[in-house]
Regions:
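Short loop/turn segments that connect beta-strands within beta-propeller blades
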Residues: 42-44, 86-89, 123-127, 165-169, ...
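An edge-strand/N-cap motif at the start of beta-rich repeat modules
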Residues: 1-46
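Short beta-strand elements that form the blades of beta-propeller/WD-repeat-like
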Residues: 18-32, 66-76, 109-115, 120, ...
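A short beta-strand motif characteristic of beta-propeller blades
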Residues: 1-6, 46-52, 89-96, 128-134, ...
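Solenoidal tandem-repeat scaffolds enriched in leucines and small polar residues
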Residues: 106-216
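Intrinsically disordered, low-complexity segments enriched in Gly and acidic/Ser/Thr residues
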Residues: 229-230, 246-322
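Structural motif
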Residues: 28-39, 77-83, 117-123, 156-163, ...
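Repeated scaffold domains used in trafficking and secretory/extracellular systems
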Residues: 6-18, 52-66, 97-110, 134-149, ...
Length: 350
């Protein structure tokens, strides 16, 4: 089904307008201090460009907004800043006041919010940016957008916030739900833990919020709770209005508009070498009826990249990886591109 074309050292990949960007460390390990390189790769894995990223005082690095973003920290002077580099490695702009690597909130096209200690507006084409003031949220984590609203969790994911974009001038709270007390539960160590947003599905005018205790169906526009179910729903990958998931171990399919589970199968094993192996799954991508997952084989500690046919309900392809769970899968044309934080592989569809 897929033929491997190449394998390269990589700690992160990103696809931006069909351009393949990759970060790698000189010694092949996922750690700083050995030289960081930014690559642009062709669909066949050839290096189109290569540039070193300045490492002195580097704190965090990532690929966002079609650029390489690097948070630097000069602790001796008490100064932190973010520098954005082009795919070719040229320094484009430096931004002070974020205090660390920001969360990135897309606004459309080349416009973004950068969320750190302060909230910034940022245009990745013009490089214009503006400090919009201190971010009022406690440990915010961006969870996505739906129905014209942006969603954050805060306070160790105990609260969900719906925010309205004020035309690039900031984000205004529309509603919030607090699960800390209402969904308390006994944790792994026998202690009472606050309720948290574990899984969030945004579709149409529904937000499906799963905690350790139950699942809430919430009206995205108002925050009103429409229904409560005494079970959890995983985060689905949606195609054609149907959400699919193998996580944590059963195949589920859900009509997202109606909120109806169409399929909830028994716990799956992975067929390999004539055996049915116990395993866990991490959903990565759904495309053309195939659900791509990272498979953890519990008996060996190894990981696979596998494709699951959602109609036939069986695995149709896999490739063995190493000892790390895969982070991401992308499809560009007839190329499948996957990364596990140490390595990127490019496959051609046959």
């Amino acid at each position: 089904m897929y033929r491997r074309l190449c394998s390269r050292v990589s700690c992160e990949i990103a696809i931006w307008n069909d351009r393949i960007l990759s970060l790698a460390y000189a010694n092949g390990l996922n750690g700083y201090g050995e030289g960081v390189q930014l690559y642009e790769l062709s669909p066949d894995g050839a290096v189109l460009s290569e540039a070193p990223i300045p490492e002195e005082r580097l704190q965090t690095i990532g690929l966002d907004c079609g650029q390489c973003m690097v948070a630097y920290n000069d602790r001796t002077r008490g100064r932190e800043w973010l520098t954005c580099f082009s795919p070719g490695g040229g320094a484009l702009v430096s931004i002070e006041g974020l205090e660390g690597y920001p969360g990135v909130i897309p606004r459309g096209s080349s416009e973004f919010y950068l969320l750190g200690q302060h909230l910034f507006s940022y245009n990745s084409q013009t490089l214009q940016h503006e400090d919009l003031g201190l971010a009022p949220w406690d440990l915010p984590l961006y969870r996505g957008a739906c129905g014209g609203l942006h969603f954050l969790t805060e306070a160790w994911q105990t609260r969900l916030l719906a925010l309205r974009d004020l035309g690039g001038r900031g984000l205004e709270e529309v509603w919030r739900l607090d699960f800390a007390e209402r969904d308390q539960h006994v944790g792994w160590h026998g202690r009472v833990e606050p309720g948290q947003v574990n899984f969030l599905n945004l579709y149409g005018d529904d937000a499906w919020i799963s905690t350790h205790v139950r699942t809430y169906r919430v009206d995205i526009r108002t925050g009103q709770i429409r229904a409560v179910r005494a079970r959890f729903l995983p985060e689905f990958l949606v195609e054609g209005g149907i959400g699919y998931s193998l996580c944590p171990g059963e195949f589920r399919a859900m009509d997202m508009a109606r909120g109806v589970l169409l399929r909830e199968g028994p716990r799956l094993s992975f067929p390999l070498g004539g055996e049915a192996l116990r395993c866990g799954f991490k959903d990565l991508l759904v495309r053309d009826g195939l659900l791509y997952v990272s498979v953890s084989l519990w008996s060996s500690g190894l990981y696979l990249l596998a494709a699951f046919d959602t109609q036939a309900e069986r695995f149709v392809w896999h490739d063995a990886w190493g000892g790390c769970s895969l982070d991401s899968v992308h499809i560009v044309g007839d190329r499948l591109i996957a990364c596990d934080g140490d390595e990127v592989r490019i496959y051609a569809r046959e």
